[in-house]
Amino acid sequence: GVAGSLAIHERYLKQYRGITAATVTPQMLAKCKVLKERIVQQWSSGNDLKYLDSIPGVTPFLGATILAELQPLDRFQKIDQIIAFAGLDPSVKQTGGKPGNHGALSKRGSRTLRQALYLAAFGTFHHAFRPLYDAYRNRGLAHTEVLCILSRKILRIAVALLKKRRMFDPAYLDRT
């Protein structure tokens, strides 16, 4: 199994290289931290990241990820295309001539963008998005469903901010 395979590799590394998992893990975590900082630094050098950073709960790393996945924005004609690219559009289940029912998320497109938006939604519902989160929860929607709705909302806001080159304004929550 996997555990046995890992044990064999760990013994090999320890025996021939003097390396143990205890020494590798902190080194890998440190390298990951440095890479994240470099990514944010690289994307911060452009002006577009500041617009996404202005959204409450969106971290610089998530903002950089969202920006990297959306660029160039002019390849999309409509916001619905961007939502579909993120895989945040509902799938339609249809059979024969019967009208379709909306099901779960389609999950087409960029998995990385979808995950970044979901994490951003998870961070934002503690801030300016809390009233919106509570309103959807009071309608009987599950926590995950509301986070998916907030993900779409964040995507719409992010695209509007990038196109209009403006900082986040809580009034956007009522307009999008």
Protein language model features and the residues they cover:
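A detector of single, family-specific signature residues
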Residues: 1-176
